[in-house]
Amino acid sequence: MAPCHSRDASIMIDSYEHGVQVIDENKEFKNPNISKYLSLENVTHAGFNYHLISVFGSQSTGKSTLLNHLFGTHFSVMAERERRQTTKGIWMSKNKNGGEVSADHSARMADNILVMDVEGTDGRERGEDQDFERKSALFALATSEVLIVNIWEHQVGLYQGANMGLLKTVFEVNLQLFLKDKNTTHRSLLFFVIRDFVGTTPLQNLQTTLMEDMSRLWDSISKPPGLENSSVHDYFDFQFYGLPHKSYQPEQFVAETKKLSLRFREGQRDPAMDARRGKFSEGGVFLPEYHRRIPADGFSRYAEGIWDQIVNNKDLDLPTQQELLAQFRCDEIMREVMLVFDEAITPFEEKQSQAARLGEPEVLGGLGAAMRSSRTKAINEFEIEASRYHKGVYQRKQEELEDKIDTRLKALLQGQLNAAHKSGINEFTEAVSAAVKMGQKHGTGYDFAEIVNGEVRKAVAKYEDVARSTVVESTSWRDYSQELSLYEKELAEVSGRLRREEMRRLASRVERWVQSRLGDSVGLEFNALGSGRAGGGAPESGEKPSEKAFWDRIWNVFVETVLDAERRFTDRASSFDASLEEVDVGLWRLRRKSWGVLRAKVDEEMTEGNLLLKLRENFEDKFRYDDAGVPRIWRPTDDIEGIYTRARESTLTLIPLLSRFRLAETSAPPPLDRWIGHTPSSATPADEEDLPPIGGVDEEEGKSLEEEMTILSEAKSQELTVRFKKSADGVYVEAKRSAIGGMTQVPLYFYGLLLALGWNEIVAVLRNPAYFFLLFVCAVGAYVTYQLNLWGPIIKMTEAASNQALVEGKKRLREFLESSDTGRQAIAMSTSGAGSGRSGEQYEMSDFSQKSKTASPADEDTDTL
């Protein structure tokens, strides 16, 4: 690729061997050709380090030849055998003798000298048409630093031959330019090169003659008001040089031409050289004030604008043209630097935009460095290229460029800070939650406030690191304090939310603890309901609890449990760095929740089945046990009805007692409204939304405290009373039946008969110590069995054992009979005699039935005992 490119460039340069045509003979400007030529000659990026020279003179006077010898150019020259126009329009070429130095190395040609060969005047091709002469002169004066006037020695003193008409035009044009831009004096150098100078007339005399002509020309032109007394020296500098005849003195011509070429270097004004006194500088011709201050890369556009105004006969306004050029070039430079800027920044913008669409904020690595480097590079490159142009336009465009760049970079910064904000909040939340879970998992305890404060410091430090690494220090939007403040504010809000959630979890744990404690304590109170008299529920020691103070005990247990829970909650909340308002809200919610727990437990214990069971147990404790807690053995002589009535009425008094939550001390409901307290002013709707209404506390619910304390309605109480009475009646009937069944039916004469017939045996037993001791042991065992009410179970066990032995004996007998011949014959005989034996069987069954009827009362007595 490199050799091919080099070959193409060589071909392009060869095509411009004779220079480039700036304006053709038809007054058309060749802008593309000029830009291309300057680029090929490496002048485009020279900035102000270039110089422009134009040559004037009559047609066919050797202007192109002079330029070719001076600057090594290859302008077309007239053939010596023909006298015709060679240069058409205006041509331009770069100095080919660049870097040439004098023999003593004291002088060196300037770099990047551009030479314009202007079409000669007074040519027969244009005849009377002097329009192009005037326009080309105006163009050359507006663009060139040095105007070379090519004149033969013998033409000095002539008007037409010395191009006095053209010079008059130059003077008039210069005044025209001055009027358009009074702030700038468009100074130029008129360099008279006197050709075919033989020295007969001294050069100083020729200078005097030409300067007199210049003064007369200046005086003859019409001047605007205020410039009537101006001098030609106010606008032009003059230098003169004589060259030998090219044909007759070729060697001297070449030598002098080389010597003259070294005059085309940069120089400084010498105050001692005053043209008014006939002293002309022989130093470098390129003074700083001659330069038109048009950068090389904008020359083509500037020249085109100048020529457009000239060719359209518009007043030439160089400041306006310079501003237009500056605007055009600044826009071009801005586009170029923005392309490079886009290459660096667009990928970050796309990544950020994609992350925003996906809802996954991402902190882009390397964004800050890319922003700073791309911004600095773009602004510096723009400054290097555009600062050469009109200052006002440049500054305006620079601000425009900075605004354009900063708008995009600021958007990137905002996106980066937003990403850091969102990701930081998420990471903060996850870190706090993880630390809390870790503390809960290890069971070592944790300080929530310390965790939150530590994570807040980490989050803020990370956010500031991202912000500092992203901001561009030299910009007006480098301050991110507002964003940091918003971030810290949201961190505080999230911290508060996490603290409230943690306090909610703490409250839930405390509520579960309250629920567990109340469940046990309240359950014990209900289980002990009426058990203080006797029975399995009676306490082993101490006084029996009063049934009237049942709700007092429940309330005291409840208050003590909740106070203990409040202390736990307050101690734990202090590690959360919670405010007093938040603690007040938490305690208020705890009291309300605890009341709900108590009420739920009471409702559970007071369900119809549970309450009916407890009432029956209470009744049975009073009915089946005496005041000492000894079980009653019912006898016919006992006042069963009286005991039953007292026990039933005593138990029935529990139903109205349990129907309403009332304290025995005050005969009124507990002060639930005062105990819970008013709703804290800092409570939010979210704090209240999960709380059920409480009668007497939440007045807007329309439920009074009396209604809140009602456990059983009247209908439920009546229904419960009826069912309890039925259950108590069943117990009473059972007791009555037991007492009646225990009465003996043995006649009195039986005891006399038993004594008479068994006297001998009685005496024998009494006289024999062994028999007596055995009788004593049996009597003691019978008494103990009676006292423990074990006769019934013993008799039942004996009957069951005898029945089982009878069944087993029958089974073994049948097996024996079936296994012997005699038995099988007997079975066969019994089968054949089944008909005759049925009546006997019926008799036996009838007898057994009768015996059974006779024995049943005795069996009942045995069971009761």
Swiss-Prot record:
Which segments constitute the GB1/RHD3-type G domain? 47-303
Residues that bind GTP: 57-64
Composition bias type Polar residues, residue spans: 824-833
Q: Which parts of this chain are annotated as the region Disordered?
A: 673-699, 824-865
Localization annotation: Endoplasmic reticulum membrane
Molecular-function annotations in GO: GTP binding; GTPase activity
| Keywords on record | Coiled coil, Endoplasmic reticulum, GTP-binding, Hydrolase, Membrane, Nucleotide-binding, Transmembrane, Transmembrane helix
According to its UniProt record, the EC number is: 3.6.5.-
Q: Where is the composition biased (Acidic residues)?
A: 686-699
Q: What does this protein do?
A: Cooperates with the reticulon proteins and tubule-shaping DP1 family proteins to generate and maintain the structure of the tubular endoplasmic reticulum network. Has GTPase activity, which is required for its function in ER organization.
- Designated name of the protein: Protein sey1
Organismal lineage: Eukaryota, Fungi, Dikarya, Ascomycota, Pezizomycotina
Q: Which gene encodes it?
A: sey1
